[in-house]
């Protein structure tokens, strides 16, 4: 009996169950029609009986029986003409249970034997064109590819050829050959830097901070004052000793030459462009031999103080500065003569291509004068570290490069001065805090105790790093784990000794 006969209402669960079991069977109705027409009528009837069995409701005899029982019921109710057929009687028994478990018969079909003939492609395309089928339907990749016959006929070699297409790369490179991001960024950076430099000179320079009356002056006068201030700042920074160098005042007729023609930004790149009005201009035919005659001979100076004063005034690291007049006041103990001025000046003519000016540099001392000055300027260093003991150490200096710090504490064992020398104060302090401490910790080596007994127990180490060096040097045959055990024993059995 069916649900219609019983008059019962079907629930949503029943509807979903029917759809799940009968979905594939409905889709394969067209394929079933293409089967061999010589199929036995008994097998066809069994399939129809299985399809109709899931549409019945609340019939325990139908839902609980197995496939074999269902086959027996079908055979008993078959028409007489089918039973009389000798071919049907000799046919093998149908595998009803196996047919029920085969939900998707297309899984057993290989991809090579499957073609577009199993599916009505024209009907599916018609549904897609009319919008009756959703494009995002639950199609398998195999089913979706079988719809497009052209895609199924493609070979894998064609896809590899598309990936390795050199013509496409050449077309792309030719199309975007002029697209150079790095060059554009560099041009933008240069333009921005130039604009920033111009704004800095025009707005933030000290020229704009002058009074209103000074704004009426010419550009040359304002640049002259601006560079004059810069030169005075350089003099104040480059002087090594203000007491030895007199304050230099530039004359009022200080002028600039060809500033705007050589440098439009208004900044001086070469200090040799500054020319004093009262001094003679330096020409290209000036020679170093003629001007070096006026230099004082450093080897003839008998006093080392005079040599040192001259060397202090010379800035040997700055070769691009202009000529700096230097004056030093020297007095003698046995004579009260007026102050004598010693001027050291040296000019060197350097001719540049396309320029008519030369650069002047400062005089450099000889190697002998440098040695005398360096030996005089060095002063002995005295270092007195703070310690808790009264007598700590002495500082001995054998030569200019080696310094030794000697410990003068009394050794509690020998009752004599320790006399240990160290090259660093850190080592001396660590030595005094460990060896000469009133209460210090000691470490023992377990391997020495095991091998030597009491003698090994008397062997102690003031620091743990000393014990580590002892293990590496004396117990080389120990493994890494055994060395760690020795160190662990020393840490857990620390001894203390009072002086």
UniProtKB/Swiss-Prot annotation:
Induction: Expression is up-regulated in a fluconazole-resistant mutant. It is found in: Nucleus. Residues 329-397 are annotated as: Disordered. Keywords: Activator, DNA-binding, Metal-binding, Nucleus, Transcription, Transcription regulation, Zinc, Zinc-finger. The keyword Nucleus applies. This is C2H2-type transcription factor RPN4. One of its GO terms (cellular component) is nucleus. PROSITE patterns: ZINC_FINGER_C2H2_2. One of its GO terms (molecular function) is zinc ion binding. It comes from the Eukaryota. Residues 331-344 have a biased composition (Basic and acidic residues). Transcription factor that acts as a transcriptional activator of a number of genes encoding proteasomal subunits. Plays a role in ergosterol and plasma membrane homeostasis, and subsequent azole resistance. Regulates the expression of 212 genes, activating 80 genes and repressing, likely in an indirect fashion, 132 genes. Targets comprise several proteasome and ergosterol biosynthesis genes, including ERG1, ERG2, ERG3, and ERG11. Directly regulates ERG11 expression through the 3'-TTGCAAA-5' binding motif.
């Amino acid at each position: 009996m069916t649900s219609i006969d019983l008059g019962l209402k079907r629930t949503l669960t029943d509807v979903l169950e029917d759809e799940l079991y009968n979905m594939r069977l409905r889709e394969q109705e067209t394929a079933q029609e293409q089967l061999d027409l010589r199929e036995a009528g008994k097998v066809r009837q069994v399939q129809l009986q299985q399809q109709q069995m899931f549409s019945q409701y609340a019939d325990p005899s139908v839902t609980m029986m197995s496939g074999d029982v269902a086959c027996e019921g079908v055979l008993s109710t078959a028409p007489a003409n089918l039973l009389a057929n000798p071919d049907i009687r000799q046919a093998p028994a149908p595998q009803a249970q196996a047919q029920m478990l085969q939900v998707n018969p297309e899984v057993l079909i290989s991809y090579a034997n499957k073609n577009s003939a199993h599916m009505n492609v024209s009907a599916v395309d018609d549904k897609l064109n009319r919008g009756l089928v959703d494009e995002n339907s639950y199609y398998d990749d195999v089913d979706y590819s079988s719809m497009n016959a052209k895609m199924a006929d493609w070979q894998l070699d064609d896809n590899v050829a598309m990936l390795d297409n050199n013509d496409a790369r050449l077309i792309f490179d030719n199309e975007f050959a002029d697209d150079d991001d790095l060059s554009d960024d560099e041009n933008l950076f240069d333009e921005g830097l130039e604009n920033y430099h111009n704004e800095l000179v025009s707005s933030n320079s000290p020229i704009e901070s002058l009074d209103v009356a000074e704004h009426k002056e010419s550009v040359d006068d304002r640049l002259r004052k601006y560079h004059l201030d810069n030169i005075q700042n350089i003099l104040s920074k480059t002087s090594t000793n203000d007491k030895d160098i007199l304050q230099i005042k530039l004359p009022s007729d200080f002028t600039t030459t060809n500033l705007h023609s050589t440098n439009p930004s208004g900044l001086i790149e070469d200090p040799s462009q500054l020319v004093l009005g009262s001094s003679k201009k330096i020409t290209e035919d000036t020679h170093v031999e003629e001007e070096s005659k006026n230099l004082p001979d450093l080897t003839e100076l008998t006093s080392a103080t005079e040599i040192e004063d001259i060397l202090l005034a010379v800035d040997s690291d700055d070769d691009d500065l202009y000529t700096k007049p230097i004056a030093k006041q020297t007095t003698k103990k046995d004579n009260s003569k007026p102050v004598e001025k010693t001027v050291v000046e040296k000019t060197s003519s350097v001719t540049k291509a396309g320029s008519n000016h030369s650069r002047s540099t400062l005089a450099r001392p000889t190697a002998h004068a440098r040695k005398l000055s360096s030996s005089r300027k060095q002063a002995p260093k005295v270092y007195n570290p703070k310690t808790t003991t009264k007598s700590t150490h002495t500082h001995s200096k054998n030569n200019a490069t080696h310094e030794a710090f000697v410990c003068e504490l009394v050794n509690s064992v020998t009752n004599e001065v320790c006399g240990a020398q160290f090259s660093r104060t850190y080592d001396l302090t660590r030595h005094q805090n460990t060896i000469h401490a009133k209460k210090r910790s000691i470490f023992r080596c377990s391997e020495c105790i095991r091998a030597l007994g009491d003698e090994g127990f008397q062997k102690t180490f003031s620091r743990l790093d000393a014990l580590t060096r002892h293990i590496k040097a004396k117990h080389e045959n120990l493994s890494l784990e055994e060395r760690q055990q020795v160190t662990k024993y020393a840490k857990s059995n620390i001894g203390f000794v009072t002086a």
